[in-house]
């Protein structure tokens, strides 16, 4: 190998190193962007999880309140209507107070089964 070929080889290797260094810089920049995006997404994910937990807790509390309200709503009036129906009277808005002669009334039953 003569001096010219050695010099060309060194120049070629130097160009390759420069190209690889440029690629390494681009990869480093891209990696930094990915790390920043990952951190941002983790923060957002944590925020959304806390928000979801809060909403779930609210729904559970509302469900408990509604259950208590339903238990309070079904009280003496409902019992009186059920007793009247068992005694053979209509409790529906169509035939309220009249005597049931043909067995069960679907309107009355649907009214009693409302929750």
Curated annotation (Swiss-Prot):
Cofactor note: Binds 1 zinc ion per subunit.
Cofactors, names only: Zn(2+)
Major subcellular location class: cytoplasm
Cell wall biogenesis/degradation in keyword set: no
InterPro entries named among the record's database cross-references: YabA
Location of this chain's protein in the cell: Cytoplasm, Nucleoid
Keywords: Cytoplasm, DNA replication, DNA replication inhibitor, Metal-binding, Zinc
Pfam families for the chain: YabA
This protein's GO CC annotations: nucleoid
GO biological process, one term: DNA replication
Signal peptide: none
Chain sites annotated for binding Zn(2+): 90, 92, 105, 108
Family: Belongs to the YabA family.
Function, in words: Involved in control of chromosome replication initiation. Inhibits the cooperative binding of DnaA to the oriC region, thus negatively regulating initiation of chromosome replication. Inhibits the ability of DnaA-ATP to form a helix on DNA; does not disassemble preformed DnaA-DNA helices. Decreases the residence time of DnaA on the chromosome at its binding sites (oriC, replication forks and promoter-binding sites). Tethers DnaA to the replication machinery via the DNA polymerase beta sliding clamp subunit (dnaN).
Subunit structure, interactors included: Homotetramer. Interacts with both DnaA and DnaN, acting as a bridge between these two proteins.
NCBIfam families: PRK13169.1-5
Name assigned to this protein: Replication initiation control protein YabA
């Amino acid at each position: 190998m003569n001096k010219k070929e050695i010099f060309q080889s060194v120049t070629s290797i130097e160009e390759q190193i420069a190209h690889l260094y440029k690629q390494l810089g681009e990869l480093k920049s891209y990696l930094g962007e990915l790390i920043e995006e990952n951190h941002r997404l983790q923060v957002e994910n944590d925020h959304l999880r806390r928000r979801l937990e809060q909403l779930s807790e609210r729904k559970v509390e509302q469900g408990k309140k509604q259950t208590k309200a339903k238990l309070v709503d079904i009280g003496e009036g409902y019992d009186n209507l059920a007793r009247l129906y068992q005694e053979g009277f209509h409790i529906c808005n169509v035939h309220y107070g009249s005597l049931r002669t043909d067995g069960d009334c679907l309107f009355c039953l649907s009214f009693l089964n409302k929750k």
